[in-house]
Amino acid sequence: MSTLLATPSAGWSHLSFPNFDTTLSYIDDVALILLQDFILTYLKKQVAAVTFDCEGYDTTLVLSNYDLYGIQTNTEPASFTHILDDHVREFLHQLVTNIETDLDKWASFSVFETDKETYKKETAKNKTRLQALIKEIKEHPNYG
């Protein structure tokens, strides 16, 4: 599976699959949401669903044990896409890898502070939180 989650740049990122693509905005703390609310929920054997504000429309991802679905509200009616099946574990590993590879950029992605010192502190705090979540995910018995 190729890179799913693009390196954040200028307040935007992309989540891409062969049959589904969405833009993700700095309005949401994308890395935190994906790690904490999506991957960890899934690893606890629960259906995980997250919604992102894409500035003009919403994208919702729904992950079950074997399938990933995407819902986008930028069409009328909203589009519902079966994104993948049977590759859920590979998908989760790729998301973690993509976030880990660009950890510094993800740590600062949704920091809105204009004061330089406050910005540095918030970014450092976010980086520590993301690192802790990645560690927790990698140590989870259902991740392997």
Predicted features and spans:
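N-terminal low-complexity, intrinsically disordered segments
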Residues: 1-82
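Long protein-protein interaction modules used by eukaryotic assembly/scaffold proteins
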Residues: 66, 70-144
